[in-house]
Design a protein with these regions (language model features):
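Short catalytic/metal-binding and nucleic-acid-binding patches
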Residues: 1-182, 190
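Glycine-biased, small-residue-rich flexible motifs in mid-sequence functional cores and linkers
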Residues: 179-332
Length: 332
């Protein structure tokens, strides 16, 4: 494997490695215990380390403690490296590494360093696990992503932070994380290959309404429309939108902050067999507040964004909402 990237300045790298056979050797997912310590009170014994978010965290097993210890020592051993955010899930690890190429020795080999860290972590962890050899600890395959500090880095940090909660959300609400294909519903055009993930009951609302906020207008000019959309959503109506333009993204941001609001997020691509929603999106799927809906075949890719498909999606959203209103009228 060979990586091509600019080796100047600061660079972030996101590694994912899995335990051989996906055995749960590193940690277990636990509820986050509320802190009940009185002011000025000192706990006689520090609690076992928990990295937690949204009510769930990981409690490290001895093997996980060994890997975490090595990760935290990275900077002390190599000052041009910084071990940033990480989470050790039961059967895999997500690690975010910062490399300062201004201070790195000439010819620093990132992949060679990764192999050395992998082997050291395997040796330290397997020492806590009788019967498991270091060579059999990790899967051979791994995943690496070179991050853009301005865009992908914040998303990866959120992903790491929410990973324990995301796992529990999916296990607690398998119906809301199931991928539905060949979907049929009175509001959906039967000629299209609909697929979805989330709360399908949203399709049954008679109060679906399409949202399209053009990129051609600055965000502040959309404020009256955004206020109206939020008011309708607070009163039980369901916005149907791709949430792609700056104005639409602002609507989604505000909807998420409004308890009780629900929405349908349509996408201009297919939902592949292993469609995996983001950690942030998983929060709202688990709460039954969102439906992800596609009218495209599963092999239509998400990237690069297909703008003609976005316009097709908006047109189909409008038809969907008309059918919902017509169905409500016919039942009266």
């Amino acid at each position: 494997m060979h990586l091509e990237f600019d080796k100047g300045g600061l660079r972030f790298f996101f590694f994912t490695a899995a335990i051989r056979g996906r055995q749960p050797l590193l940690s277990r997912i636990v509820p986050r215990a509320p802190k009940r310590q009185r002011p000025g009170e000192v706990s006689p014994e520090p609690p076992r380390r928990r990295d937690s978010c949204a009510g769930w965290g990981v409690e490290l097993a001895p093997a996980g403690e060994a890997v975490a210890k090595l990760w935290r020592e990275v900077h002390a051993r190599d000052p041009f490296l910084t071990a940033s955010n990480f989470v050790l899930m039961p059967d895999h690890a997500h690690l975010l590494l910062l490399v300062d190429y201004r201070r790195a020795p000439a010819g620093f080999d990132l992949l060679g360093w990764r192999l050395r860290f992998r082997d050291e972590a395997a040796a330290a962890a397997s020492a806590m696990l009788p019967g498991i050899k270091p060579s059999a600890f990790w899967e051979e395959k791994y995943w690496i992503m070179i991050l853009n500090a301005g865009t992908s880095l914040p998303a990866v940090r959120r992903y790491i932070k929410l990973n324990p909660a995301r796992k529990m959300w999916k296990e607690s609400h398998p119906d809301l994380f199931a991928r539905h294909t060949d979907l049929r519903h009175p509001v959906l055009d039967p000629a299209l290959p609909w697929s979805a993930m989330g709360d399908l009951t949203l399709l049954g609302s008679p109060f679906l309404f399409p949202v399209v906020l053009t990129r051609k207008k600055p965000l502040e000019q959309h404020e009256p429309e955004i206020a109206d959309i939020l008011d309708r959503a607070r009163n039980g109506a369901i916005p149907v939108c791709g949430f792609l333009s700056p104005g639409e993204k602002r609507v989604l941001e505000l909807l998420r902050k409004e308890p009780g609001t629900r929405w349908i997020r349509t996408v201009a691509h297919g939902l592949p067999p292993r469609f995996d929603p983001s950690a942030e999106e998983s929060r709202y799927l688990a709460a039954g507040r969102q439906l992800v809906l596609s009218s495209f075949p599963p092999d239509v890719p998400e990237f690069p964004v297909n703008w003609p498909n976005c316009h097709i999606m908006n047109d189909r959203n409008a038809v969907l909402c008309v059918r919902a209103a017509a169905g409500a009228q016919s039942k009266r």
